[in-house]
Structures are given as C-alpha cells and as structure tokens.
Regions:
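Short alpha-helical transmembrane segments in multi-pass integral membrane proteins
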Residues: 1-22, 80-145, 189-245, 301-368, ...
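N-terminal transmembrane alpha-helices
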Residues: 9-46, 60-75, 79, 104-111, ...
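Interfacial/gating helices of multi-pass transporter permease domains
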Residues: 20, 43-63, 129-134, 194-195, ...
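Transmembrane helical elements of multi-pass membrane transporters/channels
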Residues: 20-39, 141, 175, 204-208, ...
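Helix-terminus/linker motif at the lipid-water interface of multi-pass membrane proteins
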Residues: 30, 34-53, 122-129, 185-192, ...
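Small-residue-rich hydrophobic transmembrane alpha-helices
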Residues: 52-112, 149-168, 275-339, 372-386, ...
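Hydrophobic transmembrane alpha-helices of multi-pass small-molecule transporters
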Residues: 64-67, 179-183, 209-213, 285-288, ...
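Short runs within selected transmembrane alpha-helices of multi-pass transporters and secretion channels
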Residues: 73, 141-160, 168-176, 197-212, ...
C-alpha cells in the first residue's frame, strides 16, 4: 500500500514517529477550538442572549451523548490498528466491515432514543422555561444528526488506525470552515436561528464524513471490504464491543463528573461561573497537545501490539510522556506571565474578581499538567493495547474526584476548591493507570502475538 495512505508505526524512532503523527492531530484540535469559539460568538452576537444560553445549556448533554458515540468509534479503530501492525489484511478488512455494520445499528438506536427523549432530557436537566423551546430546537437537530457524527468519527478512525493522521485533520478543517460559513448563511440570510446553527453543525459533519468515503474509495484499497467482510462474526463483534463500549462510557462518565462540578460552581454565583468559563476556554487550548499525544498513543500502541513489539510500546509511552512533560513545564512558566492577558480576551480588565479567580484556576491546573500528561498517554496506550476496560475505570476515578470536590468541598471552601477538582481527578486516575499499564504489558509479554486480539 502507498505510504501516502498509511504509516507503519512499528519501525523507526518512537519519538520521531509520535511527534510526526501528533502534530497534524494537534493542528486539527486547535482549529476545532477556534471554530467552537467562533460558533459561540456568532450565536451570541447575531441572535440573542437567550439563544446563547439555550445552546450553552445543552453543552453537557451533548458532551455526554456525542462523546459516547465518538468514544465507541475510537474504540472500533483499535483492533484495526492491531491487525495493520500484524500485517493481517484479511482480519483488518473483517474488522472494518463488522465495525461498519455495528456502527449503523448503534447510530439507529442512539438517534431514535435521543430524539424521542429529547424533551424529557431537557426537563430532567431543569432547563429554564424561557429558553426551553430554543434549547429543544437546537438539541433535536444535533440528536437527529448522530449518524453524521458517527460516520466521520468511524471513517477518520479507520484512517488513523493505518497511521494516516493528516487526511482526517484536513477534512476536519474543511468541515470547521464550512460550519462557520453555514452558520452565517443560515442565521443571517435565512433567519433560521438556533435551528440553523445546529443544522450547520450536522451538515458540515456529514460532508466531512462523505469526504472520508470518497478518499477511502479512491485512495485506500486496504479499507475496501467485500460482502463476506460485512457478515457479522461473533468473535469480531465481541472484540469491537470490548474495545468500543468502554471508551464510549469513559467519555460519558467523565461528562457526569464535569456536570456535577459545574452545578456546584453555578451555586457560587455569576462571578464564579464567568471565571471558570473563561479559564476553561483557555485551558482547552492549553490541553490540546495532551489530547493529540493521547490519540497518537492509541494508534501507536495498537499497531505495535499487533506486531508483538511490546517493548516498543513501553519506549513509545516514555517518549510521549517526556514530550508532554516538557510542554507542561514550558506552558506553566509562560502562564505565569501571560495568564491575565489571555483572560482579558474574554472579560474586561475592570472585572477584577473574575480575572483573579480565572487566574487562580489556570495556574493551579497548569501546575498539575504533568499528571494530566500521564492520564492521556497511559490511558490511550492501554486502550490501544486492547484493555479498554482498565481505561474506563480510570474515568470512574476521575468522576469520583470531581463529584467529591463538587458535592463536598466547593460548598465549604468555595471557588478555590473547584480549582483542585481536575488535578485531584488526574492524580487518582494515574494511581490506577500506571499499575494497570504495567499489568497489561506484563500480560501481553507472556502471551503469543496470535492471541493478542482475543485478550
């Protein structure tokens, strides 16, 4: 197969390969953050405060549902990466076909359930009556577009499993630019309101999925499947579910902890909410390299486990952790000098209380970025090795930490306690993940390479 369409991560310098694979992912993630910011500005500036509040009120439930779908698709790509590393073309194609069929089933079920329960979900979330209708208009479209979300995430996962991180990012950037243009078209020209904003998101996501289909059809014969590959095989489906469902639940479990923490901060008043919102927006940009390294390690470890190069997995994890740790130190030092200026992008310098609390949140979290590096690199490495269940339990540890801070310590110590929620979550997750990685590596080293996918 052409080197332009795939990348073998089982040979060569781990550090160089990890950097080369993660940089395109980082570019895409940064672009996605810029798009998200622009989308918020468009809704807030060209519609109304109520529209902005309506869209914002659906954020946690979207993270819960859409995150589950994204996690499942990411998990489905892992056995494909393993088969690619093992040079098992027949097994790879069988996983591609079975993952496609299972994804269609999941898309139908998730879409039907969420669309039918959309109104009830908003009621359960205590959505204010004055924005309920707007929130429903937005959320029902997002839920109806779940198939488009699954299409892009599944196919981009296929490509990344073959070591191609560039093409999915190009299509993601195209979708983001298109989304902004469609936002302006649907909101300013067609006066479609929040419905238009949601439709723009779904349509651009669907187009990026179609672009993946076209690219795979023309350029990636390794992902072309036969009718036999589309016939469900219980052993393949079981492995897909064992890897996919824990990753999906991991996203959802993390979302639950974040919702509980946000609810606690909401009780502290508007200044605390504004402070955390501004600091969180900045943190999302700062954390993109960690996410890129994590996604890289899932593919890297998957391919190398498939090739039975277990010691190479360990070397890659060390390289990724060192890269992330160096970045962590540099960004913490930088924030000591520029944190306030970044906060001024969101609030006026005259809002001294907001600036002070946001500054506190940023620096406390940044001080603990090295534990976050390990959360991302170790967790995704374990997932790529085929042990997604362990990674899910780490997500439970994070949820417990954030929930504990939100329910117990925020009411007592206020905003300062909220600043330590994520650091505590990262440390607890690491306390589980590091021993889990050692256990998984030891188990694989004792197993024959032919048994890897059945673990």
């Amino acid at each position: 197969m052409s080197k332009n369409n795939s990348k073998d991560l089982t040979v060569g310098s781990p550090t160089g390969l990890i950097l080369g694979f993660s940089l395109p992912l980082l570019l895409g993630m940064l672009f996605q953050q810029v798009y998200s910011l622009m989308d918020t500005i468009i809704v807030g500036r060209f519609l109304s405060v109520s529209a902005l509040a309506a869209v914002g009120s659906t954020g946690s439930i979207c993270f819960l549902i859409i995150g589950f779908c994204q996690g499942v698709c990411a998990g489905f790509s892992l056995p494909i990466a393993q088969r690619f590393g093992a040079k098992d073309e027949k097994g790879l194609k069988k996983y591609v076909g079975n993952a496609g069929i299972v994804s269609v089933i999941i898309a139908i079920i998730m879409t039907a359930l969420t669309v039918l329960l959309c109104g009830q979900i908003l009621t359960w979330m205590n959505t204010p009556g004055d924005i309920y209708d707007l929130a429903y208009q937005y959320l029902i479209v997002i839920f109806a577009g779940i198939p488009a979300t699954i299409l892009y995430n599944l196919l981009s996962g296929y490509l990344r499993s073959l070591g191609n991180s560039v093409i999915p990012v190009i299509f993601l950037i195209i979708a983001a630019v298109l989304n902004i243009g469609l936002d302006l078209l649907f909101i300013l020209v067609f006066n479609m309101g929040v419905f238009g904003a949601a439709f723009a998101t779904v349509l651009s996501q669907g187009i990026s999925g179609v672009l993946c289909i076209i690219y795979i059809a023309k350029k990636v014969p390794l992902l072309h499947v036969s009718r036999d590959d589309l016939e469900l095989d219980s052993s393949y489906v079981r492995n897909l579910m064992v890897m996919g469902l824990p990753m999906g639940f991991q996203y959802s479990i993390t979302a639950i902890g974040s919702v509980i923490l946000q609810t606690a901060v909401n009780g502290l008043g508007s200044i605390a909410v504004a402070s955390m919102t501004a600091a969180s927006r900045i943190s999302m940009f700062m954390m993109c390299p960690f996410d890129a390294l994590g996604s890289t390690m899932a593919t890297y470890s998957g391919q190398n486990v498939g090739a039975a190069k277990f010691e190479r997995v360990k070397k890659g994890l060390i390289s990724a952790s060192v890269i992330g740790s160096i970045y962590s130190v540099l960004i913490f030092v930088a924030l000591l000098f520029i944190a306030n200026y970044l906060i001024y992008l969101f609030v006026s310098p005259s809002e001294t209380d907001v600036v002070a609390q946001a500054h506190q949140f940023l620096l406390i979290n940044a001080f603990f970025y090295i534990p976050l590096v390990l959360v991302n690199t170790v967790r995704f490495t374990i997932q790529g090795m085929g042990f997604s269940g362990f990674a899910m339990f780490a997500g439970v540890a994070e949820m417990i930490a954030r929930s504990l801070i939100g329910l117990v310590f925020v009411p007592i110590f206020g905003f300062s306690a909220a600043c330590f929620a994520s650091p505590l979550a990262w440390i607890l997750a690491d306390a589980f993940l590091v021993p889990a990685f050692i256990h998984c590596l030891h188990k694989l080293q004792k197993a024959k390479s032919s048994q890897v996918t059945s673990l």
